[in-house]
Amino acid sequence: MLLNISSSPISHRNPHFLSNFNNPISYFPRRSKTHLSKSHFFPKFTPLSNQSLKNRVLFGNKRYPDGERFDFRSRAISGIDLGSFESVLEAIAVLTTIIVVHESGHFLAASLQGIHVSKFAIGFGPILAKFDYNNVEYSLRAFPLGGFVGFPDNDPDSEIPIDDENLLKNRPTLDRSIVVSAGIIANVIFAYAIIFVQVLSVGLPVQEAFPGVLVPEVKTFSAASRDGLLSGDVILAVDGTELSKTGPDAVSKIVDIVKRNPKSNVVFRIERGGEDFDIRVTPDKNFDGTGKIGVQLSPNVRITKVRPRNIPETFRFVGREFMGLSSNVLDGLKQTFFNFSQTASKVAGPVAIIAVGAEVARSNIDGLYQFAALLNINLAVINLLPLPALDGGTLALILLEAVRGGKKLPVEVEQGIMSSGIMLVIFLGLFLIVKDTLSLDFIKEML
């Protein structure tokens, strides 16, 4: 599975770390991939505009009764912070659930049609744990790049005759198309169900923006701590530039000014305890020559919840939210293709996904709902692309077979196409795991 989370806006709680500004703040895409049944996770952290520091709070500029609709806190920064062990486990649980849902779609579509299935795996590579049930091997594997459902079609050790009508390769194109597309359908349904549960249980959070930028946290021994900034302060202006209530735009102004002024005084206009006053902060010099002060920043907003008053309104809320997330995913995918030179460096692997998910989990349940829903939608959209080793690539081969009057491509050709795609994804995934691991804050401090 390949996920593309490029279009996720940040929320009021999504903190931006002003300590390692190697990367601009950006949105993260995520992609999902399946060869018939093989899934791989590789996200891309892609900015929503050419001005990479320009973040936006809202999806689709929607207006709700109590303010502007906000969506979950997605962010990408150069220094990845995994946070607490509990939040990491929550993020891993979300990713694992998404993999299981996707592969279960393939598995159930095959089983319900009487098609032989031999394996159901989470992860790739060496087997860590396994058990057999009803002639199917269920396994947990070493590399967390996705999962797969295996079929005995080309297994030389299989005792099933090669002409058995219940082998996947011997079924009509419609049956095979259902199996291949079932993972996509499962993720779409799951995303809708997640949003439905969110609306009924906690409602949809909305926000009203206020001038300035909130400082949720000040790191110990940082420039900000040394020069007097405190957690809970609201920054109203920087070097005489007043900060509006446009959320991430105001955050970006602070980021720009701090980055440009290492070892130089920056004057912050602060609101604290009902009083306004100035504080001079001297940013430390980062390893890349930019300034850093060691704080988290977030838009200064007030959050309320909107709950549906009846069943029809529930479905309207859910449908609007689902369409908004889907639109964002499609926009992010379009930007990935049309601005590839700018977005290629934002590709990230499972470690970065878990880091972002952990940050979401540390915030509140609203963000975790939207994190899971968005990843499912990304998974479905990306898998529709007609590329080797993706569900869409397999569907394209089935369509080509139908156009050719049921004449299949030579087995060697089809296997070569899929195998090359899978190997590329595996090597890319391993590379990204190493890259993202080296970006972890505690690893960078050790190096």
Swiss-Prot record:
One of its GO terms (cellular component) is chloroplast inner membrane. The keyword Zinc applies. Expressed in green seedlings and cotyledons. Low levels of expression in roots, siliques and seeds. Residues 1-73 form a transit peptide. Zn(2+) binds at H102, H106. InterPro entries: PDZ (IPR001478), PDZ_sf (IPR036034), Pept_M50_Zn (IPR004387), Peptidase_M50 (IPR008915). The active site is at E103. It is an enzyme of class 3 (hydrolase). Its cofactor is Zn(2+). Disruption phenotype: Lethal when homozygous. The chain crosses the membrane at residues 177-197, 379-399, 413-433. Keywords: Chloroplast, Hydrolase, Membrane, Metal-binding, Metalloprotease, Plastid, Plastid inner membrane, Protease, Transit peptide, Transmembrane, Transmembrane helix, Zinc. One of its GO terms (biological process) is proteolysis. Its EC number is 3.4.24.-. GO terms for molecular function: metal ion binding; metalloendopeptidase activity. It comes from the Eukaryota. Residues 202-244 form the PDZ domain. It is a multi-pass membrane protein. Belongs to the peptidase M50A family. Metalloprotease essential for chloroplast and plant development. May be involved in regulated intramembrane proteolysis (RIP). This is Membrane metalloprotease ARASP, chloroplastic. It comes from Arabidopsis thaliana (Mouse-ear cress).
